[in-house]
Amino acid sequence: MENKIFSVAEISQIFKEAIEGSNYFKNIYVRGEVGNLTFNKSGHVYFSLKDNQSTIAAMIWKSNAHKLTNLNVKEGMEITCYGRLTYYVPSGRVSFEAVDVSVEGKGDLQEIFEERLKEITALGWTDESRKKPINRFAKNIGLITTDSGAAIKDLITTLKRRMPSVNIYLFPTMVQGETAKFDIANKIQQANLFEPKLDILIVGRGGGSYEDLWTFNEMKVLKAIVDSSIPVISAVGHEPDITLSDYVADLRAATPTAAAELASISTEELLKELAYNYENQIRLFKNVYNNQQLKIEEFKKQNILKINNKYDLQSLDLNYIEKSFINNINNIISRNEMFIENIESKTALLDPKKPLDKGFGLIMSKDKQIINSVDKVDINQEIKLVLKDGEIETIIKGVKKHGK
């Protein structure tokens, strides 16, 4: 029988099929010391894993590279990689393709979190004294989050429901991945230069894994929040999720919806606040009045004693004192009336139906969706015009866009 002679390509292909086709080399963990760490411009990361006896080449593709960079992995650190063995035919080299990474010892995410918290605390970034108050009567609110998903919808819906007059400006950004920290920091800086001037910034995202939320623990993002001249509300994830952004922001919200509620005041809350202030003013008025009455009675008693003891004491003009007291009371009442009128005028501005009294109308589709652009209507579409005293049903005959 003639001996089989293999070409180099054939034997390499046999090796490849044997290694990559075997379940034994899939879904395995390899632990070793990091060496030859290279961050390729393509986004892939190449390195080696070694111990006292051997070395193996390893790589992690761009899609999973953040799992390594988030851990601040450096050469000499011991890590555990999860993945599979591969065989590269052109060079005849066996490599380990990692899809996940964990760091041994002090390098895991939780310890990095705790060390970074100590660092920002020492810098004074978490001090309550440096945090700015939140204006709940904000006119302009900026949202720094992704432009898709439940978080942005919840934010806009809640803000508009509670405070219809508010202006909302979205600064869309990546919220996870290797470059997300730079994107978020840049958007915070852009928002601080934006015109009209913003009253509040809400920075955050919806829920995700601990690793998904890690961007909001990055120093680049934390520094941008601290440097913001606009008050920042941190709204990352769900109730149990805590990030370092929560520590440095001016206010922490458990969820994006909660952030919208903290950034606004509803009509019901406003009326309660007005009632509370009114009751305080009445209480103050009564206290002033009662104190003045006590002073008058005490004054009368003292002067009666003087008159009884000294017959030559001239009568005091109590009418003058009473007139002065009445003038003081009238001044207090006038100030309270001006305060209440001012509050009532601000409350009227929050009424979404007020513009209808001036001849404006609200355009709605048949399914009661508000139409605010010609792009949202079609020819022959039935629509409703809501006026202050009723509704008009009509049909679109033509559409003309401004500037065209």
Curated annotation (Swiss-Prot):
GO terms for biological process, alphabetical: DNA catabolic process
Keywords: Cytoplasm, Exonuclease, Hydrolase, Nuclease
Domain of life: Bacteria
Subcellular location: Cytoplasm
Single GO MF annotation: exodeoxyribonuclease VII activity
Family: Belongs to the XseA family.
Name under which the protein is recorded: Exodeoxyribonuclease 7 large subunit
Species of origin: Mesoplasma florum (strain ATCC 33453 / NBRC 100688 / NCTC 11704 / L1)
Gene: xseA
